[in-house]
Amino acid sequence: MNNFAVFILSNGRPDRVYTYETLRRHGYTGRIVLVVDDLDKTKDEYIEKYGSDVVVFDKRAAAKTFDQADNFDDMRAIVYARNACFDIAENLGVEYFMQLDDDYITFEWRFDNYNKYVPYRLIKRLDRVLSIMLEFFKSTDCATIAMAQGGDFIGGSDGTCARAPTLMRKAMN
């Protein structure tokens, strides 16, 4: 996975980038890039803590590349960073990337080998999981794929996602 990286999108909380350590704790050994905008007052703290793993993008320039669908000028949305990741990836020579928010505290399996719902089982070999996801992505015509999130399993074993696991038309974070 030499041409793959995980981008962690963060703003204003360099001391609470939980996702970085969570990735490592769950067995991800690949490249991690923290994506921070130039208007973030704490960007220097990110650089101090994470060094060359931080990429700072021009938020105003990013805003000019798409319809913001926003009548306000405060630019308090993650969409700027999400869209900037494509240029960042190209500049870094990264062909494939995963975007994550900065507050992930765990990666879990929700199904066993028999496709039976299990409420909680930690992923320990995240490198392997992401490698398989990347191979799946390459084998499809999909423009994006995503992992399920904890909220998808509200209701536990009686919830819709647990009773009838399937591909969903939803990608978040």
Language-model regions: role of each:
Residues Y96-D101, T144-A148:
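A structural signal for short, well-ordered beta-strand segments and their strand-loop junctions
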Residues D38-M98, I105-V118:
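Active-site-proximal specificity loops/subdomain of glycosyltransferases
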Residues V33-D37:
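Short internal beta-strands
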Residues M1-G27:
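N-proximal low-complexity "stem/linker" segments adjacent to membrane-targeting elements
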Residues R13-P14, A62, D103-I105, G150-F153:
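Short, solvent-exposed loop/turn segments at secondary-structure junctions
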Residues S10, P14, F72-Y80, Y120-D127:
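Conserved phosphate-coordination/catalytic loops
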Residues F107-N173:
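Conserved catalytic core of nucleotide-sugar-dependent glycosyltransferases
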